[in-house]
From Swiss-Prot:
InterPro entries for this protein: Ribosomal_eL40_arc, Ribosomal_eL40_dom, Ribosomal_eL40_sf, Ribosomal_zn-bd
Protein name: Large ribosomal subunit protein eL40
Gene this protein is translated from: rpl40e
Cellular component terms per the entry's GO annotation: ribonucleoprotein complex; ribosome
Gene3D superfamilies, alphabetized: 4.10.1060.50
Length: 53
């Protein structure tokens, strides 16, 4: 069952799957409001890449 038909479910899924930050040094997943990496304490964070079809 595709979730692209229901915009509310799609918004929930997109927030759950793409709303976090990735450390550029070690690749760890961090919360979206993180200032430093939880694993290596680096400040070199980026948002999760999102490619919409």
């Amino acid at each position: 069952m595709p979730i692209t038909l229901d915009p509310e479910k799609l918004a929930i899924v997109l927030q759950h799957r793409f709303n976090y930050k990735i450390c550029r040094n070690c690749g760890a997943r961090n919360p979206p409001d993180a200032e430093k990496c939880r694993r290596c304490r680096s400040r070199n964070l980026r948002p999760k890449k999102f490619k919409k079809k």
